[in-house]
Design a protein with these regions (language model features):
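Catalytic cores of the polymerase beta-like nucleotidyltransferase superfamily
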Residues: 1-418
């Protein structure tokens, strides 16, 4: 085991809900530690989400100790040794130490154990195989601490065998590298992912979607996605052409504008050129209706936006709304190869912040006075007037609006002359 180190930057170990759970589970011959992502992120000074706990205690003992301490327990996966304890409305998954007796794909015949090293060896990557006890001492049975220091994502054990256990680990390898790694992906892991690419086809769309969405917004997404493309690993996921250049362009544009990473927007840059691509991705990744609509809108004639003048941009913004306008324009920017500091693109994309979209000022009453009654005719005249108002660049003066209304009625009457 690698020499342990003390984790000082983890106040949640000293007080709060996690510390309480550890205190309840420790003692009388049993030990509990925080494991996995929380330890990794604490060591990397990254935000910590869920805190998972492993223990030598069997599930029944976990439940009985929780009950005695007044802590709610939920047997969420008790057949696998997992009990969820809820403290101050925060859930903690507590899992009894396990070791594989026999593995076959994602399935494994496991036995509860008391060996921390055997439990750590079941995890996927070395940086996820660390544990920390209540005193803040980090225990490393798999070589994770040197990999944390090097920001290196490495499989525990033989990469090919670990991938064959669950082919989702191919996507996890790149996603974890994009989130926490540095430089090129670990060579042995990378080659094993390429060799095992055929296994991606058997994964459920829901599981693939989860990893793809997390990958899209990771800090190192550009490098990871490029490595996947070079290894032939994007085609089995997206099923069609992909565009790493525009993907990099979208990331650069988001950063230049100070925007939060958006998974769907980045996915559009990577894999959507026309609206049919959005429909294909929706099926392959089980996208929500809202996500599909966003992708579909991005792919709709985005190429018409690149050379707009300011007046045309205002009309597009009026028709599309701020979100669809920005998304579609950013796709055009990313696909144009334009520099992220290009003033013209920046001006177009930031138009919604600089210009308030006005409401169309003409109403039904304005046309009733001109002999147009409620009904289909009114709708057609209003549409003609709105088009003319946009073409005139949104005038607000009374005389201009009167002229637009008169012209719309005259055109309608001319077009519908018996």
């Amino acid at each position: 085991m690698t020499d342990a180190r003390v984790l000082d930057a983890a106040p949640w170990l000293r007080s709060g809900p996690a510390a309480r759970v550890l205190a309840v589970l420790n003692g009388d011959g049993e030990e509990a530690r925080v494991v996995g992502g929380a330890v990794r992120n604490a060591l990397l000074a990254a935000p910590i989400g869920d805190i998972d706990i492993a223990t030598t205690a069997l599930p029944d003992k976990v439940i009985s100790r929780a009950r005695a301490a007044g802590i709610k327990s939920v047997p969420t996966g008790i057949e696998h040794g997992t009990v969820t304890l809820v403290v101050e409305a925060r859930p903690f998954e507590v899992t009894t130490l396990r070791e594989d007796v026999e593995t076959f794909g994602r399935k494994a015949r496991v036995a509860f154990g008391r060996d921390w090293a055997r439990d750590a060896e079941r995890r996927d990557f070395t940086i996820n195989g660390l544990s920390v006890d209540a005193a803040g001492v980090v225990h490393d049975h798999v070589g994770g601490l040197p990999d944390i220091a090097a920001r290196r994502v490495r499989f525990i054990g033989d990469p090919a065998r670990r991938i064959a256990e669950d082919y989702l680990r191919i996507l996890r390898f790149f996603r974890i590298h994009a989130s926490y790694g540095s430089g090129e992906p670990d060579r042995a892991g990378y080659l094993a992912c390429i060799s095992g690419f055929a296994g991606l086809a058997a994964l459920s769309a829901e599981r693939v979607r989860m990893e793809v969405m997390k990958l899209m917004i990771a800090d190192g997404a550009e490098g990871a996605v490029t490595a996947m493309a070079e290894g032939g690993l994007l085609l089995p996921i997206f099923g069609s052409v992909f565009y790493t250049g525009p993907f990099a362009g979208m990331i650069a544009a988001e950063r230049a504008l100070g925007l939060e990473p958006n998974a769907i927007r980045r996915l559009g840059a990577l894999a959507v050129a026309v609206t049919e691509d959005a429909k294909r991705l929706s099926g392959r990744l089980r996208l929500t209706n809202q996500e599909t609509k966003k992708l579909d809108s991005m792919g709709h004639r985005w190429w018409r936006l690149g050379g707009m003048d300011e007046a045309t941009a205002r009309r597009r913004l009026y028709r599309l709304g701020a979100e669809r306008y920005r998304d579609r324009l950013m796709l055009a920017w990313a696909r144009s190869g334009g520099e992220p500091d290009c003033p013209r693109w920046r001006e177009l994309v930031t138009l919604p912040e600089r210009w308030s979209v006005p409401k169309f000022p003409l109403k039904a009453a304005d046309f009733a006075a001109r002999g147009i009654a409620e009904g289909p005719a009114l709708g057609q005249v209003l549409a003609l007037a709105e088009d003319a108002w946009l073409a005139a660049d949104f005038p607000a003066g009374e005389s201009a609006l009167e002229a637009i209304a008169d012209h719309a009625v005259a055109r309608f009457n001319r077009d519908h002359r018996p």
